[in-house]
């Protein structure tokens, strides 16, 4: 049996996410927006809770199309609040809409959100060499810089810990444990 990070075992959806997505470098703006929203939703919750509702979030937020989400009105907020498959937190729903508008402004300024966000790690994946989760930080200098800049640009629910979780998910950092078979596979 191959070694993994261990956090995805026992839950098929978490295992699939660990094995196929987590830490894989993202260069698609729609997926960047999806991770920004979902990591914000996760604040105060477990990733497992959010991941098990991911399809409902995709449905509620027009597959995380930032152009569509940026146009949402109060009626859309109410529609999402009534969606039975998501965690109904008005502040987080309103943050997703606000973040979509800020996301589009970043795209316009930099040509893509991808180009902007990868700038925080010098354009290449930061490869960590953790042997246990106790070595892994909750935030880093890069996630603090990202958080500060995103907030300056109008984003919300983007504190340094949320930004670090986003960086892990979107592959800006490789935080697979060195014993995990994915540690080498996701390095790009």
Task: Label every PLM stretch briefly.
Residues 1-188:
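HhH-family (HhH-GPD) DNA N-glycosylase catalytic core used in base-excision repair
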């Amino acid at each position: 049996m191959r070694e993994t990070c261990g956090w995805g075992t026992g839950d098929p959806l978490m295992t699939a996410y660990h094995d196929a997505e987590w830490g894989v470098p993202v260069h698609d703006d729609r997926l960047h927006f999806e991770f920004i929203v979902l990591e914000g939703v996760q604040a105060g919750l477990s990733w497992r809770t959010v991941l098990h509702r991911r399809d409902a979030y995709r449905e509620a937020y027009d597959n995380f199309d930032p152009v569509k989400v940026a146009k949402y009105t109060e009626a859309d907020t109410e529609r999402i609040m009534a969606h039975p498959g998501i965690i109904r937190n008005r502040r987080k729903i309103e943050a997703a809409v606000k973040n979509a508008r800020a996301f589009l402004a970043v795209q316009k300024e930099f040509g893509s959100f991808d180009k902007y966000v990868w700038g925080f790690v010098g354009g290449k994946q930061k490869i960590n060499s953790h042997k246990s989760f106790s070595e892994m930080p909750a935030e880093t200098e890069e996630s603090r810089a990202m958080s500060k800049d995103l907030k300056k640009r109008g984003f919300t629910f983007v504190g340094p810990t949320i930004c670090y979780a986003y960086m892990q998910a979107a592959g800006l950092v490789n935080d697979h444990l060195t014993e995990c078979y994915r540690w080498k596979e996701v390095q790009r």
